[in-house]
Design a protein with these regions (language model features):
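Long, charge-rich, low-complexity alpha-helical segments
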Residues: 192, 212-213
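A generic structural motif
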Residues: 26-35, 105-117, 213
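Long, hydrophobic/aromatic-enriched structural stretches that serve as scaffold segments
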Residues: 54-93
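Eukaryotic partner-binding/assembly regions in large regulatory complexes
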Residues: 72, 82-140
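A structured, charge-rich N-terminal accessory region that forms the first stable segment of a protein
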Residues: 1-57
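A general structural motif
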Residues: 1-2, 23, 73-77, 104-106
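Short helix-coil junctions and helix-kink-helix linkers
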Residues: 196-211
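A conserved mid-domain beta-alpha-beta active-site/ligand-binding segment of alpha/beta enzyme cores
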Residues: 122-196
Length: 213
């Protein structure tokens, strides 16, 4: 059956569009849940913080939700693409499980790290890899949907600077959470370009959480 694919970000969208999965519908969400005020999300609104974007930015999800509702009305199965290491798409999965927990539809999920443990997000996969990953889809049971929905409810109304994934669990932290690790890496490297510092930190951090399971 043709499925409606739910993805995060334009990178995954472009790659999926070039794959054999093109015959399936694609709904792209691009709002960053991990640093947003989630308290207004019942109205399909998100506020991104001034601390990061220099001004408060209000985002509307009504367009994406409308497409999702239309897909469900047309009896299409829903497939969410995510990873246990990608906070952006993982929070989207939690939100959708909460939104759909009382809806009559089949909900599937694929995790990129189940295809390759070093693949931290569907966004880093090629067309043929996405096609292979689709074969690993897992239909969520009602119990699983409720469990994911519960996780969403646990964080939805809490105050936090940003959400991250550690050991495959959502953790709510402050903006200075990584300060000590970044400063230690900077001391080790000495004079270094910011882009290299960020790249090395992200690589080291991914290796750390990937090997601590």
């Amino acid at each position: 059956m043709i499925k409606t694919n739910i993805i995060f970000g334009s990178s995954t969208f472009v790659t999926m569009r070039e794959s054999k999965l093109l015959n399936n519908d694609i709904i792209e969400f691009d709002t960053v849940f991990s640093v947003a005020d989630l308290s207004k999300l019942d109205n399909y609104e998100l506020t991104l913080p001034k601390d990061i974007y220099n001004e408060n930015i209000n985002c509307l999800l009504s367009k994406e939700i409308k497409k999702l509702n239309e897909a469900i009305s047309n009896n299409k199965d829903i497939r969410v693409w995510t990873s246990h290491f990608d906070i952006y798409s993982y929070l989207l999965l939690l939100y959708l499980c909460d939104y759909l927990e009382n809806r009559d539809c089949n909900l599937y999920v694929v995790f990129s790290d189940e295809y390759n443990e070093n693949c931290c997000s569907p966004a880093c996969m090629r067309e043929n890899e996405l096609e292979e990953l689709a074969k690993l889809e897992h239909k969520l049971s009602k119990k699983e949907i409720l469990e994911y929905s519960k996780k969403w409810k646990e964080i939805k109304d809490k105050k936090f600077d940003m959400a991250i994934l550690e050991n495959k669990k959502v953790k709510l932290v402050s903006f200075d959470y990584y300060n000590e690790e970044i400063l230690n890496l900077l001391k080790e490297l000495g004079e270094v370009k910011i882009v290299r510092l960020v790249g090395l930190f992200m690589n080291n951090y991914f290796i750390t959480i990937n090997t601590s399971q």
